[in-house]
């Protein structure tokens, strides 16, 4: 059986790592897997032995994914006799491409990581449009995979569509020498900073972390927010952090730079309003870091069975402040939570 995964970015991070790791697990179990990604150039490479065919696209993810889906069609049609399943990274943009591949005898499925209409950056009209497009897409998509039981319930309750659940996962870190100067370059203090890494989007509530950090005088500690701040929301949170030199924006972090931050932080923070199954949180847990999190279903699904985490309600600055202070005052006791994870 040969499965082709389509829709990953050239850097296997965040939600993209779900696609790469799924392909890798299939390969380990004796199945053929192949990834089609988008990036800055056309090339063929590999990820831990999984072949990757990369297509050059322009713009952001929202414009790159539909372009990739269309660019992949000639290859899929040409090699249709060798391909059993085509798995698309998103449902919404995959309707027409998946119909085409099915016409040529291949099976198709699509992944739901999160529901776009839940993001607070969208107004009422846009949310209605997103929900209408998702409803239409799901009507034409036979096989749907999602990343958590929580998300499967949300999709069923909202759209009456049943999904198969393939949970997110991350590889446990290995000890290796890191080739990065991210700590020195940004004057980040080892073991003295709160960390969050991810897509810079209003749904992540970074302003809550910033307000909590600024309102309590964290003189000896830092808050590090990793991600691409070159968008409207990014500019807003940078402006909000002004006047506090201990809030640091190192930009997009991959590879060794990301490992260095995860390895040396004191706690990993995720205060989102909504998540699929948060890979960023799993990465923080894999390094034994204390989770500072919001009480939302997808995070509860990950943490509550272990009875760990410092919890807050969504957008509650006071509770986040209390959690940060607790870590600073009682780090040696609370760090056991991270080790338990």
What do the predicted segments below correspond to?
Residues 305-316, 325-331:
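Conserved acidic donor-binding segment of nucleotide-sugar-dependent glycosyltransferases
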Residues 273:
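Aromatic "clamp/platform" in nucleotide-sugar-dependent glycosyltransferases that forms part
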Residues 88-94, 112:
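Short His-centered aromatic/hydrophobic patch
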Residues 290-293:
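Short hydrophobic beta-strand element within catalytic cores of glycosyltransferases
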Residues 139-163, 170-174:
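A short, active-site helix/loop in glycosyltransferases that binds the activated sugar's phosphate group
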Residues 4, 187-204, 210-214, 224:
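Conserved donor-binding/catalytic core segment of Leloir-type glycosyltransferases
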Residues 77, 103-104, 127-144:
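Membrane-proximal helix-turn-helix segments that form the acceptor-binding/catalytic region
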Residues 235-253:
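Nucleotide-activated donor-binding/catalytic signature segment of Leloir-type glycosyltransferases, i.e.
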């Amino acid at each position: 059986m040969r499965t082709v995964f389509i829709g990953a970015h050239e850097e296997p991070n965040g939600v993209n790592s779900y696609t790469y790791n799924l392909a890798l697990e299939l390969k380990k179990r004796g199945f053929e897997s192949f990834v089609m990604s988008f990036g800055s150039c056309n090339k063929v490479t590999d990820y831990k032995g999984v072949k990757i065919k990369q297509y050059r696209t322009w713009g952001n993810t929202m414009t790159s994914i539909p372009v990739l889906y269309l660019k992949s069609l000639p290859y899929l049609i040409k090699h249709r006799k060798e391909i059993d399943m085509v798995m698309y990274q998103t449902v919404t943009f995959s309707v027409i491409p998946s119909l085409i591949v099915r016409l040529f005898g291949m099976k198709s499925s699509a992944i739901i990581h999160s529901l776009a209409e839940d993001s607070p950056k969208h107004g009422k009209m846009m949310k209605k449009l997103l929900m209408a497009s998702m409803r239409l897409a799901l009507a034409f998509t036979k096989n749907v995979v999602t990343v958590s039981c929580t998300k499967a319930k949300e999709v069923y309750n909202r759209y009456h569509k049943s999904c198969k659940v393939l949970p997110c996962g991350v590889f446990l870190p290995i000890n290796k020498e890191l080739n990065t100067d991210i700590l020195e370059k940004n004057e980040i203090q080892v073991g003295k900073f709160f960390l969050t890494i991810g897509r810079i989007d209003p749904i992540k509530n970074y302003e809550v972390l910033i307000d909590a950090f600024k309102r309590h005088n964290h003189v000896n500690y830092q808050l590090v927010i990793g991600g691409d701040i070159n968008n409207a929301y990014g500019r807003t949170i940078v402006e909000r952090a002004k006047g506090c030199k201990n809030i640091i924006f190192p930009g997009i972090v991959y590879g060794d730079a990301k490992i260095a931050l995860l390895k040396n932080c004191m706690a990993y923070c995720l205060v989102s309003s909504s998540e699929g199954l948060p890979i960023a949180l799993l990465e923080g847990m894999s390094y034994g870091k204390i989770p500072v999190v919001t009480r939302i279903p997808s995070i509860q699904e990950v943490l509550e069975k272990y009875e760990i985490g410092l919890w807050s309600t969504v957008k509650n600055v006071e509770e986040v402040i209390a959690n940060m202070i607790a870590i600073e005052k009682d780090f040696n006791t609370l760090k056991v939570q991270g080790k338990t994870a």
